[in-house]
Amino acid sequence: MGNRRAPCCDKSQVKRGPWSDEESERLRSFILKNGHQNWRSLPKLAGLMRCGKSCRLRWINYLRPGLKRGNFTKEEEDTIIHLHQAYGNKWSKIASNFPGRTDNEIKNVWNTHLKKRLVKRSISSSSSDVTNHSVSSTSSSSSSISSVLQDVIIKSERPNQEEEFGEILVEQMACGFEVDAPQSLECLFDDSQVPPPISKPDSLQTHGKSSDHEFWSRLIEPGFDDYNEWLIFLDNQTC
């Protein structure tokens, strides 16, 4: 078997349980007069039926001068929470930042008070996050439903709007192409002014010379090959 540290005292010959006021005063008086160089031998020298470890803890946590009693302030509690996040359960290291406070006292206030507060705060924060997410989801769903309904209304109204626009466009086109013109050409001419239709006579009436008859016959039924020949013919007739 490996080397084991010998117990500080015979447990069968030591007293257990709470310290009495008489025991506490005897320990205080001895340490203030002689100091505490060796905790193993101190109980026997002080006349106490306690083990060395119990004497040391009683002195450090309750009897030594300069201990700060009473409840922790709000600033002390916040500092303990901050240091616990950095050091964990290293109570002696945390207690070194609190003059007059013991590591045992800090451990007790953490386990009985501060840890429960953090648990409640975490639960409250989680519930708030869930509520906010639910409200946000509900608001988003309502917004989506409203948007869909608006699109449906717009689409249902759009055919009627297109039909009305088509009717207006047809009316505007009809007005644009309307011409302020007389319904009949009779208003442009009197009956005496309208020329009679021209038709080819069945027989030619002869008036004057035979050359005139020849001229008009060729004019009505031209037989010239080209325009120049026709002009020459006209010149000959006028000479």
Curated annotation (Swiss-Prot):
* A Pfam family this chain is assigned to: Myb_DNA-binding
Induction, per UniProt: Accumulates strongly in the root stele and in the outer layers of the lateral roots when exposed to iron (Fe)-deficient conditions. Slightly induced by ethylene and by darkness conditions. Accumulates upon potassium (K) depletion. Induced by zinc (Zn) and cadmium (Cd) ions.
Protein's cellular compartments = Nucleus
Q: Which domain of life is it from?
A: Eukaryota
What keywords sit in the KW lines?
DNA-binding, Nucleus, Repeat, Transcription, Transcription regulation
GO function terms (MF aspect): DNA binding; DNA-binding transcription factor activity
Q: Does the keyword Electron transport apply?
A: no
Give me the Gene Ontology terms describing cellular component: nucleus
Q: What happens when the gene is disrupted?
A: Plants lacking myb10 and myb72 fail to induce transcript accumulation of the nicotianamine synthase genes NAS4 and NAS2 in iron ions (Fe) deficiency, and exhibits nickel (Ni) and zinc (Zn) sensitivity.
Note the SMART domains from the entry: SANT
InterPro entries per the UniProt record, alphabetical = Homeodomain-like_sf (IPR009057), Myb_dom (IPR017930), Plant_SW-associated_TFs (IPR051953), SANT/Myb (IPR001005)
For this protein, the DNA-binding region equals 39-63, 91-114
Q: Which residues form the HTH myb-type domain?
A: 11-63, 64-118
* Tissue expression profile of the protein: Expressed in cauline leaves and siliques.
| Swiss-Prot/TrEMBL GO biological process terms | regulation of gene expression; response to absence of light; response to ethylene; response to iron ion starvation; response to zinc ion; stress response to nickel ion
Job description of the protein: Involved in metal ions homeostasis, including iron ions (Fe) acquisition, via the regulation of NAS4 and NAS2 genes expression. Necessary for plant survival in alkaline soil where iron availability is greatly restricted. Triggers tolerance to nickel (Ni) and zinc (Zn) ions.
Question: In its UniProt entry, what is this protein called?
Answer: Transcription factor MYB10
Q: Give the species this sequence originates from.
A: Arabidopsis thaliana (Mouse-ear cress)
